């Protein structure tokens, strides 16, 4: 498999304890569950209008600046195929689908590497002639958030700054950017529904919308987007739970002598001297984690783990204690 297209979902069998995929493990809110059921039962074509209005209201933007997506990943591919940039810069280590999308249309890509001790970005490392820059905030797999002044440092005339905010529901922040791509996969546990959206200028949204097939966002995704955009309590509650679970997991890893980096998201990046062996031994015990050698700038020592429930996290810590 092309390493740019390797993602955590291929690493976990159905019966494995899945720390490879960063999807919140708790049940979905009842209102969301019912909306999904009602959408599947309906025989109507998808109608994006209510979801678009709800998202616009949440972000206090005109509806013309909202584009629903068949998962956040569609946004990167739409941008690449619609704009055909001259020179793309992608900040790494990070999600690799933007690289794959640009490669598919022949756009040269420069990988701008974060400083590895704290995974900070220096905007001066971005080539001056890059007319599109993609950066994660919060960043996957490092879990950090770039300060607003760093993101502003990417801005430049005739350049589009694209922020992958797929994990932003876990953090009460507005990442900014000319284009912001968000996902319902992570916090709302909707990986299979493929629901995301893009915020940008009305002109760019119109351009992107004109390049895709009709009804690309299914009825279940539209229903989910409408419900989730109006629900501010669930992200707040989950963020509080996550902070406690993540802190407990970090303490357990510290006790085992495992290096981690500070994270605001629902995952942690680990450094393990014998990472490839440990990944295999955990897999033999029915636990899937994400080896990170396929991320530019990382290698076999780096492993990403999701933050799951307290019992699941304790199971992982016990298994790590056995194999370290």
Place the predicted regions along the sequence by residue:
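Conserved PLP-anchoring active-site segment centered on the Schiff-base-forming lysine
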Residues: 80-103, 108, 112-115
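PLP-dependent enzyme catalytic core of the Aspartate aminotransferase-like
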Residues: 284-285, 296-324
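N-terminal "arm"/small-domain region of PLP-dependent enzymes with the aminotransferase-like
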Residues: 1-46, 54-57, 129, 159
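Short loop-beta-helix segment that forms the pyridoxal 5′-phosphate
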Residues: 56-78
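PLP-dependent aminotransferase class I/II
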Residues: 28-29, 178-259
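Active-site phosphate-binding strand-loop segment of PLP-dependent enzymes
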Residues: 110, 114-169
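Conserved PLP-binding catalytic core of the aspartate aminotransferase-like
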Residues: 243, 253-285
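Short, conserved charged micro-motifs
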Residues: 30, 274-281, 312-315
